[in-house]
Amino acid sequence: MHPLLFLAGLCLGVASAAPQLYQSLDARWSQWKATHGKLYGMDEVWRRAVWERNMKMIEQHNREHSQGKHTFTMAMNAFGDMTNEEFRQVMNGLKIQKRKKWKVFQAPFFVEIPSSVDWREKGYVTPVKDQGYCLCCWAFSATGALEGQMFRKTGKLVSLSEQNLVDCSQTEGNEGYSGGLIDDAFQYVKDNGGLDSEESYPYHAQGDSCKYRPENSVANVTDYWDIPSKENELMITLAAVGPISAAIDASLDTFRFYKEGIYYDPSCSSEDVDHGVLVVGYGADGTETENKKYWIIKNSWGTDWGMDGYIKMAKDRDNHCGIASLASFPTV
């Protein structure tokens, strides 16, 4: 074939492929907006550009996963039109400070440690919730641990009110929908003498005046305990007492768009944590020598995120993402 004919054919092929590519992106963009109820004004061009960059990043990661370079996959979700900075500003609301001198839990030596634990199977865990665009992760982490301890005591699983914590725990140091600390949430319930149910005091993803009503209280805290910042201590305590509140680094895009598999990203910090979650179990895929051990983490970003709202996070890999750095639980 003549070289000029070959080049002409190549150019024609590229030109014809480009409209198909953009048509495909147009369809996916429209479908994504419809799925997540997104409506834009003047900023749609910018949001579309951000979404496309995130989509390309996700697809590149998944190609590398298929080549064995990663242990987890990613997927587009409701956060796709946000930059990383925007996402962190509206979703990761844990206010970090030096740990107060509180009681440190010493796990009993006589506890038999099973090879795997999943407190969901024992009835300790309420369905996955959605914090919305509110810096309220700390409240969801705290209610999750308290829900588990109340179930352990009473045999009844009752969903507790995050809104009660968001609206009422400022005296203990929290900042409502602008962020807070898990231990300060426990301190509020202890000081207040109770916490209302989710049914009586529903969540609406923004701050309001305190509307706590003692007659609707269904939980109390007698004390709370910090766990030494070691994964083995976290494992022993989790197996012994039930779901544990924890703080992690959730700032990376790989976490934001996590879909399934064991989450391990070398860039995830073990010290700079910014998001409250609930540890509900641990286990392993395959043999423990293959770096396939994981923590089972309940998030508060709805069931469309991750594995129906959960994530498997790498376990025993140098406190990956800070999973053991700020773990605690209440007693009731």
UniProtKB/Swiss-Prot annotation:
Zn(2+) 1 binds at residue 121. It is found in: Lysosome; Apical cell membrane; Cytoplasmic vesicle, Secretory vesicle, Chromaffin granule; Secreted, Extracellular space. The active site is at residues 137, 275, 299. It is a peripheral membrane protein. Zn(2+) 7 binds at residue 274. Zn(2+) 6 binds at residue 272. GO terms for molecular function: cysteine-type endopeptidase activity; endopeptidase activity; metal ion binding. Zn(2+) 3 binds at residues 183, 226. Zn(2+) 2 binds at residues 162, 198. CDD domains: Peptidase_C1A. Pfam families: Inhibitor_I29 (PF08246), Peptidase_C1 (PF00112). Belongs to the peptidase C1 family. This is Procathepsin L. It comes from Felis catus (Cat). The gene is CTSL.
